[in-house]
Amino acid sequence: MSSASFTTKALSVLAALTAASAPLVAASPAHALANARNVTGSSTTSDSIVRLHIGNTACTGTMITPTWAITARHCIPEGGIAGAAIGSSTLSQFQQVSQAILHPTADLALVELPNQASSNTVDLYGAHVQPGENGQAAGWGGYSAFGQNVAQQADVQIQRRVVNVPSPDRTAVLLEGTVSNGRLVPGDSGGPLYINGQLAGVLSMSTDVENDALDGTVGWYIPVAEHAEWIAYYTGKHIAPIAGAPAELVDATANPTFIPAPQPFTGSSIGGWALGSS
């Protein structure tokens, strides 16, 4: 695998997913948490979040070793990433990026830093994620969209493991989760799905519909447990054997996604919508 640059391809495409008020939904590069809350929890999860600077835009990533972060492959543009700010605050440490290694098929990328970060790192979730499990999404999209100086988080419940999601890459195997207490908007691409303080998924896509109130209420995550060997090979990270087996794979075209009803706006400090590519 080389560190050659990757030309970003828009993942936006109309998808026949199920929603009470929006039968046509786009699965687009997933995006900032709006109407959410500041990242909380252990210092491990809050310190490990990374804001990746990509020209005039940004993505989110997660530190998994002192020198390696993981993010979405579609976040890596032609020419690469300029730098990374590590931690949940804009006062976090900043480093230039040495290289980015792209997964050959999945929407994953590994970003190497030249120096060890002083932040904590996270372990991969030790089991294959199952429907019904609850976790937290975290991201830096609010920094660009709303001027938030602290990374934001929302709650996610995994609904199913899917393939054939209406998008350019119908072969992608993804964890589909509904988002509550916040919504995904541009800038959270590549961000973590934490379960029990460990990294279970990397954000790849989110809903993008005509009714803005439904945007970002469903996210699709790359299941990192299914790519543990690739991650360990390039980063040198020790990864314990993954427990259990992957959940049943559901065809998302034959069995369309259910989009939950829009949540009421709470008037939090990051209200409003900023929709577009990451």
From Swiss-Prot:
> Would the keyword Secreted be found if you checked this record's keyword annotation?
yes
Query: Which cysteines link up through disulfide bonds?
Result: 59-75
- Superkingdom: Bacteria
GO CC terms on record?
extracellular region
Q: Which UniProt keywords apply?
A: Disulfide bond, Hydrolase, Protease, Secreted, Serine protease, Signal
> What are the TM regions of this chain, as residue ranges?
none
Give all residue intervals belonging to the Peptidase S1 domain: 33-236
Q: Give the signal peptide as a residue range, or say none if absent.
A: 1-32
InterPro entries the record matches: Peptidase_S1, Peptidase_S1_PA, Peptidase_S1_PA_chymotrypsin, Peptidase_S1A, Trypsin_dom
Q: Which GO terms describe its biological process?
A: proteolysis
Q: Which GO terms describe its molecular function?
A: serine-type endopeptidase activity
The listed locations are: Secreted
Q: Where is the active site?
A: 74 (charge relay system), 123 (charge relay system), 189 (charge relay system)
- Asked if rRNA processing is a keyword of the record, the answer is no
Q: What is a single Pfam family found in this protein's UniProt entry?
A: Trypsin
By sequence similarity, the record places it as follows: Belongs to the peptidase S1 family.
What is the name attached to this protein's record? Putative peptidase Cgl1093
Q: Which organism is it from?
A: Corynebacterium glutamicum (strain ATCC 13032 / DSM 20300 / JCM 1318 / BCRC 11384 / CCUG 27702 / LMG 3730 / NBRC 12168 / NCIMB 10025 / NRRL B-2784 / 534)
